[in-house]
Amino acid sequence: HFEAAYPDVSVEPIEFDFADPTAGLAGGTTEVALIRPPVDLPEHRMLVLDSESWVACLPRDHPLAGRHEVEIAELLDDPIVCAPLTAGPWRDYWMAMDARGNRPPTIAAVAATYEAETTSIARGLGISFTTSSVARFYDRPGIVYVPIVDRPPSHVALVWHPGTLSPQADALIRHVQQNWGFEDGDETPLDQH
């Protein structure tokens, strides 16, 4: 663990809502963050730490709620609960804009947290697209999660700006690289995902 290897360095976990999917990197309030691309940070680098499949979060009485899996096209006409406009390309990604062609989504509600999102869905306002881990952590009465079989995986990445790192942040990145089996040069520009 990083703090055992570097006892004089404190890692401060800070949670950001959907309004800032860059987790403070864009505004410079954080040096290193765990995020889900895509985000608009062209000068940043990342290490992809994990990948997850997409799921649909549906009201329990939705016509497809009893299915074992769905395709994205089956859900594109449903009203959607989405992130705030400030989320930029991240919002578009989670509304599956790439699969919609020129059909704009019907926005049922805007939610800046998973709690607000799942509450809106449980109330029957709309659906959302998210990841399989959210299905494990945010199960609640009134909603059901159904795997989406035809979406590329969503990635979890450690992200940083290489030109502005403190020695402590650089040590954290090197620690992750060494302990997760990454080689020098395994990091990629953020715009490649």
Please place each PLM-identified region on the residue numbering.
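Central regulatory/effector-binding core of bacterial HTH transcription factors
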Residues: 1-41, 111
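Conserved functional loop/turn residues at catalytic and ligand-binding sites
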Residues: 10, 28-29, 48, 74, ...
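Short loop/turn segments at beta->alpha junctions
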Residues: 17, 71, 112-113, 131
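Secondary-structure junction motif
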Residues: 36, 65, 70, 79-101, ...
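Beta-alpha-beta core module
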Residues: 41-48, 52-53, 114-164
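Flexible hinge/capping segments at coil-to-helix
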Residues: 44-54, 58-80, 167-170
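A late-sequence structural motif
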Residues: 144-193
